[in-house]
UniProtKB/Swiss-Prot annotation:
Keywords recorded for this protein, A-Z: Nucleus, Transcription, Transcription regulation
Main location: nucleus
Comp. bias intervals (Basic and acidic residues): 130-140
GO molecular function: cis-regulatory region sequence-specific DNA binding
Regions of compositional bias (Acidic residues) in chain numbering: 246-258
Gene transcribed to yield this protein: ELL3
Polar residues bias: start-end ranges: 168-177, 268-277
Subunit structure and binding partners: Interacts with AFF4. Component of the super elongation complex (SEC), at least composed of EAF1, EAF2, CDK9, MLLT3/AF9, AFF (AFF1 or AFF4), the P-TEFb complex and ELL (ELL, ELL2 or ELL3). Component of the little elongation complex (LEC), at least composed of ELL (ELL, ELL2 or ELL3), ZC3H8, ICE1 and ICE2.
Organism (species): Bos taurus
Gene3D superfamilies tied to this protein: 6.10.140.340
Name recorded for this polypeptide: RNA polymerase II elongation factor ELL3
Family: Belongs to the ELL/occludin family.
GO biological process assignments: positive regulation of transcription by RNA polymerase II; positive regulation of transcription elongation by RNA polymerase II; regulation of epithelial to mesenchymal transition; snRNA transcription by RNA polymerase II; stem cell differentiation; transcription by RNA polymerase II; transcription elongation by RNA polymerase II
Pfam families noted in UniProt: ELL (PF10390), Occludin_ELL (PF07303)
Amino acid sequence: MEGPQELLSGKLRLCFTPAARTSLLLLKLNDAALRALQECHRQQVRPVIAFQGNRGYLRLPGPHWSCLFSFIVSQCGQEGPGGPGLDLVCQCPGRSGPNRLHCLGPLRERLTIWAAMDSIPAPSSLQRHNRTEDARDRESWQNVGDYPEADTISQSQMGLEEVPDPLASSQGQSLPGSSREHMAQWEVRNQTLLPNRDPDQALPPSASQKHVDKKRPAPAAMVELKQKRLRTLAPSPLQGLPSQDLQEEDWEQEDKDEDMGPRLEHSPSVQADSESLSPEEVPDYLLQYRAIHSAEQQHAYEQDFETDYAEYRILHARVAAASQRFIELAAEMNNVQRGTPEHKALEEKIVQEYKKFRKRYPGYREEKRRCEYLHQKLSHIKGLILEFEEKNRGS
């Protein structure tokens, strides 16, 4: 991760010395991922990586923090079928001299780590984080989906090796790779509580907290965060997008998908509506997750919740970051009178930016639908767990 010590100039000799049985990847990552990797190297801890097809997760563990990134592997450096690729060349000091370079092998694939990072810091870490860090440029959403059309399949669930608990708090250590955007997402999620419940009213401890080490008391902050993780879901990142102002065909078609209602929470009306649907229209999670009747069933539901929640948070961060620019433009349109030249110019600007956005982020629709699906599924599971705990507390 260190740059060259001196500039290369003059005539250079290139030697081909590829390493045997070694695959080389071109790594593309943002500053947050780089800082987290550097911190892992400094702490001498090994990152955990999980592949499934061309996608995967990268977890960077630390003593009191944990960062979770998503990535995709794609072809790199080719101008077309059979076109020239990229080679990894290094300058090795020694008897060969400074003007001798060594080619270690071709770079056929690129591993891109998304700028949208999923991390779970403790509240004390958030309060002590350096607030002078520059905010991400508003145009950075264009780099969120830089991958080919063939890689637009939705993310599927995948297992990861065990890493230290990301909810463990630290009173004096900030989270490497965090930013104000992630702190804002954390605050929004913590402020989104269940309906008909006082924000200050604590939920009953769930079965997942029974597995806390009984040899020492669990920190109050960790228990509270585990409760919030079960009881709160971030509001849909798709709310606030315009739904009727634009007349362009491409944007109108997307608006039909963007016109989402308020976020779904567990309620009797939701279950009543689902019962009137045909079997083909009923979501699979309504058939799979019925009322809970035992502690073992509750524990299984909680495990499924945690598994889907990790994927949901990554997708939510990506979709929210991609949608934020259009939410800002829609807010500008609301402040301009319809029919005026300013309104038409702004409308044209949104259409053009949207067309460029579709090319840069071809998998946006699929990830958006997957994010909404997980949001509704997690809300359903959460409601069943709370309903079971409420029933047991009253008996």
